[in-house]
Amino acid sequence: MECYYIVISSTHLSNGHFRNIKGVFRGPLSKNGNKTLDYAEKENTIAKALEDLKANFYCELCDKQYYKHQEFDNHINSYDHAHKQRLKELKQREFARNVASKSRKDERKQEKALQRLHKLAELRKETVCAPGSGPMFKSTTVTVRENLNDVSQRESVDPINNQQDLIPSEEKERDGTTALAETETASNCTANNCQIGDQSQAVHRHRIGFSFAFPKKATVKLESCSAAAFSEYSDESSMEKEFSRKTRFVPSTSHLQLPPPTCELLSSEEKGNSPPPEAMCTDKATAQTEERKITSNENNTLLTSSFCQLQHYIPTCSEADTCQNLAPFEDQLPMEAVIVNEDGPVSKSNPNIIEKNPTVPNDRTSAQMTTEENITINDVTKMETRNKIDHEPLTPSSTIEESIRLQKRPDLCKRQCDPFVPVLNKLGSTVLQWPSEMLAYTTTEPSISYSCNPLCFDFKSTKLNNNQDKNKLTLNDLFSEQKEDCCKGAHADCKDVPIARVTNDETGHSKNDYPQVTTLSPVHVLSNGCDLGQNENVGQRYKHISCTNRQTNKYKFTRCQIKRDMLNEKYDKMRLKETREHWFHKSRRKKKRRKLCRYHPGKSSKEPEGSGKTERSRQRTDEARKNPREPVLEKHPRSPERASDLHQLPDERPKAASTHLGEKETMNTTVNTESNDAAPGSQNCGGKNATVVNEQAKPLVIHSVKQNLTYVRTYCCWKARTSRYQEDDGSLASQSNVKGPTQNQPVKRGYSSLTNDSERIHRKRRQHSCSYSSDESLNQQHHLGEYLKPLSTSLISCQPKKKRRRKRSRLHIGDGTTKMKGNSNYPMKCSSLSQPDELAKDCIKEDINPQENVSIEKNSEQTEQTEIKGMLHPYNPLLSEPSGEGEHSVTETTPCDSSQTSNDLATPVNVTRDPSNSTTDNTLLEHNQRSQTTNSNEKQTPFKVTNPERNFRHSQAKSYICRYELAETIPQGKTNEASTEWLCYNSGILNTQPPLQFKEAHVSGHAFVTTEQILAPLPLPEQALLIPLENHDKLKHLPCEVYQHIIQPNMLTNKVKFTFPPPPLPPPSTPVQPLPLQRPFCSTSVTTIHHTVLQHHAAAAAAAAAAAAAGTFKVLQPHQQFLPQVPALARTSIPQISVGTVGPRLCPGGQPALVASPQMPIIPASVLHPSPLAFPPLPHSFFPSLLSPHPTVIPLQPLF
């Protein structure tokens, strides 16, 4: 039945009439819009409808025929028809959607295919193929090129051109280092290359390589005889990388098979590029036949074999890389074959020939690398190892390797240019592009290239390994370049040295004196192959020994272990560069241990053999640099005597040197540049000083970046030293006389080397802890070591037993041993910047009453014994000044010391860091005499004091808080416990202002204490607290009472270290003499915190002491940067308070307390003690002079 309900949404009839009625259809509307139609019109319309019935009233969608217009319209408007219409539209829409999606997919596929094609095209065009981009990413087959001859011809010709290009650059590299003969030979080589290359092109042009692959899962077991056919440099490479990857092939001795028969098979460029044996062995006339003879020849076996193997016998592409490929790569073959050549003929052969090798192999390898990119190493492991070896300038032992590889590095990049080797398939129809990474070659006469199935090859690992090698390259490039530069400089000298002499006498120097020798003179290396081991540390010695064993034992597999050791050492050295600071701490500890064993008190006679040897090796280095040195020797009257020390040692081989040399190896590269500059200075002060200079320069040099700074430092030290030397020459002589003639110079040397080693360690370490603002700060660093020596010597005599027992082995060498040491090194103390005239300026003129000194000395002795425990703390920011109230420290400063107070703020750190100085009073006596003589130069009357006094003066002279600050003596324990941050602070402040003269203030017979003394570490053994307050600025203006509450006892316990020394001896009864006071350095003196952990007694004793005496304290904030020039100040401000028995002396009852600024809280000795000792603020009139230097910089309001 028809549905007569219309679709409500429709507003038009099917014939286009507008329909304003919703609901049941009533019929069409009249034209005029009236609902009521004329009857006539109605008839007409009906008639028309009937006429049109059959034709017009057919619904195609529903396939229905209507005879009446009304019926048709009803149908059109019915739900039935509308539903069908909707279904139809949905179908159409869905179809369209499907079509669109399909078309889109097709488009995407086409785009991807196009992209793939473009990528493939680009990859084929690429000149360099990164490892790992092999067959996985590229189609391995290509249509056969029509003319294979063209391919082989082009590829064989190119290498020759490349090689010719390479030769000039290499010759440039060798310019300064190699002789004319070498250049001529190289040029001849190139000529030969051209000729032979042209000849051989015709012969080998038709050949193309072939390859076979093992099935994927097949475990191929090669018989021993057949396995010998495969070149085993895969094994060699795995020696290097064994810890990371296992070797793919069974190790065999086959890799030693000499490739000489290859010379027949050598491709055009191979013959040209490989150093023709005529070139290598000058006496040989013809290339091919002679080469065979040579290889058969036993003596020359080593030369030719090593060279043949060194020369990548990489066949050109023309020879299809397989048949002629005598692959043993130089890189896989340990260069030691060449280096350790012990056969007579090799060492006899011209140095030119051997020296030529670095270039010749390069010429050849470069050419072959470029041409023969196709044939790489056994697997990528080899590639990595090759890169690794190339990029790692090994330790000086493998210096020839290094030089060759340095030159070869550019070639490596070119070598990888052609990532695929064209290989003919079985049918001969197509040329397979075989990834060259995977190819390896046998050493058989027609060398066969073999590789594993590409599906089995691990490209990722090779890529990772190559990345690692690149990283290593970045680190080692600097090192190797430096070595290269050094080598160029010293190469001429190296050549002059007769080999016999090198082996006997100069193995000692060869490392220090001629680091270049080891680098670039292969003659030296060849002759000394075994001897070099002595110079390097033990691991490298093993390396050389292993090299000889390898040669004799046909490269036994034990080389894996040795090489692993080598690699570990290399990595250690790299790590040393990267994380020096940690390493320095470690090495310092080790050195201490070694010295404990080495310098045992009973063995003082043997000592020169141990410690002295290390120094002797260095002295030999000085001796070896005769050219710069000898004029200097003549300059200075006393230097020849000391220089004699240098020459007494020729026979003794310093065994201990090897232990230290490992550390120095990294330094040696840079030391050369500076050693020449430092040499005169070191010679001036005698052999010992020379050694000291070199040592100092070396650790400083570790930062190759700072070469110029270190140069300045060494130079300045030398100047100051020379001036100082002239000043002190007489005093030294008198001191030596005082000491007595019986002292052994060897013993002295031992002592000097001992102190130098420790100094060197400290200096290295200091170099990292300090950030220096200028060259002067570096200079300060240079001198720190000097300060150490006398101080530690003074301390040792008084040290408590425990420490003494530990250090005695190092320190108690005997009274005689240190006699010259303090003096000889002392000249170095002159501030490196100060010239002799500047010395006079900087020197502080002081008057001291001998009585005062005596009293001070007694007091200092007493306090010192109590406090020595802390003495050995490695960082001693506050140099231990005798515990006498610092009166003595100022008086005792020698002019050099005073000048260095300005320059050597770093010195405080050093002083106690080197406890290893021997304890003789003699050195102290000398030191005091020197200081007295220098003072007398400045018109101060020299006075003599007892040995204990001298001890303390000796140590006192060393402690300077700041150039402008009167360095108050602090118990040496306290000084030793000072933190390294003080060093950072010191380095910057030093050079900002001219030294201020000392001021004497007398207050009622008591020494008037200026801010210097307030701030300076007092020699009091009493308890003191370190109160690190982060919000110190907020609390700065609070009165002491408020401060008291801010500081919580738990906070104190957390942040304060207590050291409990033995109870202090009673203070000396003699009244304190007026102190000569230096004008304070306003900007830093008060606000400089010696971030030191002060010594503390037991709580009861401390509390009693605190109650008994008005406390003095110092607030020093090293971490606030008060001067713009001082970049390296520590970061946290720590008010430090020491309460001691000195209070009544420093602050007599009649006068207001000195220490009363509100920002300086005074905390009682015991942490739990509730009430602080508060002093009223000082009037400004007390310190009129303090404001003058830097009024703007003073951060403390009330104190000034």
Swiss-Prot record:
Q: Which spans does this entry mark as compositional bias, Basic and acidic residues?
A: 604-666
Coiled-coil annotated spans: none
Highest rank taxon of the organism? Eukaryota
User: What ranges does the record list as Basic residues composition bias?
Assistant: 585-603, 800-811
Q: Report the GO molecular function annotations.
A: zinc ion binding
Instruction: Point out which parts of the chain are C2H2-type zinc fingers, as ranges.
Output: 57-81
GO biological process entries: positive regulation of dendritic spine maintenance; positive regulation of gene expression; positive regulation of neuron projection development
Sequence ranges of Polar residues compositional bias:
667-687, 732-756, 891-944
Q: Which UniProt keywords apply?
A: Metal-binding, Zinc, Zinc-finger
List the GO cellular component terms: cytoplasm; dendritic microtubule; dendritic shaft; dendritic spine; growth cone; neuronal cell body; nucleus; plasma membrane
Which segments carry the region annotation Disordered?
A: 252-280, 343-367, 582-687, 727-777, 799-828, 874-949
According to UniProt, the name of this protein is: Zinc finger protein 804A
User: Source species, please?
Assistant: Mus musculus
